[in-house]
């Protein structure tokens, strides 16, 4: 009987069904059970230099925060005249404005439908209102201690870096929140400057470096990658040099941070790919790829 049962079992082929009785034990595993197993079929194969290139977005924002803090320190110490910063920032904005249109040949402006006259009006309105409210900004936090202002500014700038849009499609990304946190930090720091003119120029500079500068960098990255890399390196060295003039230890730590993000982290990511094991097979959950929006109305 035992030999007959073994013969019957060998003749019957195992089927991957639950609705039919089969002459196999419950813990039986057939050789064909994993024949449809696939590993890492949707895994992205990263290239080291491509990851280094993408990390430049993070480098840009870190350098922006560093440059902003360095400029504020120079103004607070009286080493930088506000008129000089305003003139330099205005000239840089004009150059960036022209480059923004030249990079894509004006296609972006045509698609948005926005005219230069509209841009000029927006700029004049912003400068007028910011200058008018600069005395309010200067005295807004007089009742708050300086240590609290510094702590709030640090947390706001960290939040700006966390929520900034680096190009990832993630729920945590919020460009509006990131910009608002950076502007709030600039208002807090500007309130500790000597005069209302300093506060006005500091907030204006914050708009330039946290709102306008990333827009130009994004377009440079999309249309002229080589120029983008050159600008990123120049910006990083400028931030390092500015920080070095204030604190040698801080500059070294900042350089190590940039090196880790741009070189070590991409290498670690590539190394971790060797251990990636995503399995796929008929046991996966069904994926509905059809557009069902017509049934939701």
Curated annotation (Swiss-Prot):
Pathway the protein takes part in: Glycolipid biosynthesis; glycosylphosphatidylinositol-anchor biosynthesis
One Pfam family it belongs to: GPI2
Transmembrane segments: 67-87, 88-108, 153-173, 239-259
Membrane-protein topology: Multi-pass membrane protein
Compartment annotation: Endoplasmic reticulum membrane
Keyword Heme: no
Gene Ontology biological-process annotations: GPI anchor biosynthetic process
Chief location of this protein within or outside the cell: endoplasmic reticulum
Transmembrane in keyword set: yes
Entry coiled-coil feature ranges: none
Record-linked InterPro entries: Plno_GlcNAc_GPI2
A GO CC term assigned to this protein in UniProt: endoplasmic reticulum membrane
Keywords assigned by UniProt, alphabetized: Endoplasmic reticulum, GPI-anchor biosynthesis, Membrane, Transmembrane, Transmembrane helix
Subunit text: Component of the glycosylphosphatidylinositol-N-acetylglucosaminyltransferase (GPI-GnT) complex composed at least by PIGA, PIGC, PIGH, PIGP, PIGQ, PIGY and DPM2. Interacts with PIGQ. Interacts with the heterodimer PIGA:PIGH.
Function: Part of the glycosylphosphatidylinositol-N-acetylglucosaminyltransferase (GPI-GnT) complex that catalyzes the transfer of N-acetylglucosamine from UDP-N-acetylglucosamine to phosphatidylinositol and participates in the first step of GPI biosynthesis.
UniProt-recorded name of the protein: Phosphatidylinositol N-acetylglucosaminyltransferase subunit C
Organism: Rattus norvegicus (Rat)
Gene designation per UniProt: Pigc
């Amino acid at each position: 009987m035992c030999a007959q049962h073994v013969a019957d079992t060998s003749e019957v082929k195992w089927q991957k069904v639950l609705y039919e009785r089969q002459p196999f034990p419950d813990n039986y595993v057939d050789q064909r059970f994993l024949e449809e197993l696939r590993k890492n079929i949707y895994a992205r194969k990263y290239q080291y230099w491509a990851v280094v290139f993408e990390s430049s977005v993070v480098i840009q924002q870190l350098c922006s925060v560093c440059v902003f803090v360095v400029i504020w320190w120079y103004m607070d110490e009286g080493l930088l005249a506000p008129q000089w910063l305003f003139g330099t920032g205005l000239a840089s904005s004009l150059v960036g404005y022209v480059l923004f249109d030249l990079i894509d040949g004006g296609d972006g402006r045509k698609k948005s439908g926005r005219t230069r006259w509209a841009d000029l009006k927006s700029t004049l309105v912003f400068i007028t209102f910011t200058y008018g409210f600069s005395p309010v900004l200067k005295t807004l936090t007089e009742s708050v201690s300086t240590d609290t202002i510094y702590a709030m500014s640090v947390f706001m700038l960290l939040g700006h870096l966390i929520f900034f849009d680096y190009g990832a499609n993630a729920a945590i990304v919020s460009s509006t929140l990131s910009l608002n946190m950076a502007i709030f930090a600039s208002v807090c720091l500007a309130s500790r400057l000597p005069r209302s003119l300093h506060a006005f120029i500091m907030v204006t500079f914050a708009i330039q470096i946290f709102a306008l500068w990333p827009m130009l960098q994004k377009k440079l990255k999309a249309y002229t990658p080589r120029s983008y890399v050159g600008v990123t390196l120049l910006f990083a060295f400028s931030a390092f040099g500015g920080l070095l003039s204030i604190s040698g230890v801080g500059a070294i730590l900042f350089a190590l941070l940039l090196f880790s993000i741009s070189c070590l982290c991409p290498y670690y990511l590539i190394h971790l790919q060797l251990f990636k094991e995503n399995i796929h097979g008929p046991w996966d959950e069904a994926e509905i790829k059809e557009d069902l929006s017509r049934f939701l109305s």
